[in-house]
Amino acid sequence: MTNNTINYAKLNRVRLRDGMRENASTTFREFFASIHGKVSGLKGYTILENSDDNNETLVLTFWGSKADMDNYYSNGNSSLSSLVEEVKPMFEKMPERITYNVVSLDVTK
């Protein structure tokens, strides 16, 4: 495993209240900009807005190690807890989180 290897992804499936998608996506982008380079093992993220369902957004985070990912998503992460509290009023329900092993990832620059 090299320093740039992405081995894990965390899917956060977010169900939003009507009209909240733009605000939520902006908040997520600002949050990731604020933690850029400060989170051990975080290799990147992507925000996906469902083109057929305005109330669904997916946030994927990419990780080198499961330990770093698990630490980030632990209850003790105050920055993540603060983000959740900020966007909670926008949620239709709390996000579903699923961990995936990354088998293959190819992004052409």
Locations of regions flagged by a protein language model:
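Short, flexible segments with low predicted structural confidence
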Residues: 7-8, 24, 40-41
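Short, well-ordered beta-strand segments in beta-rich or mixed alpha/beta enzyme
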Residues: 8-15, 45-75
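An amphipathic, aromatic/His-enriched active-site/gating alpha helix that lines ligand/cofactor pockets
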Residues: 30, 34-42, 62-98
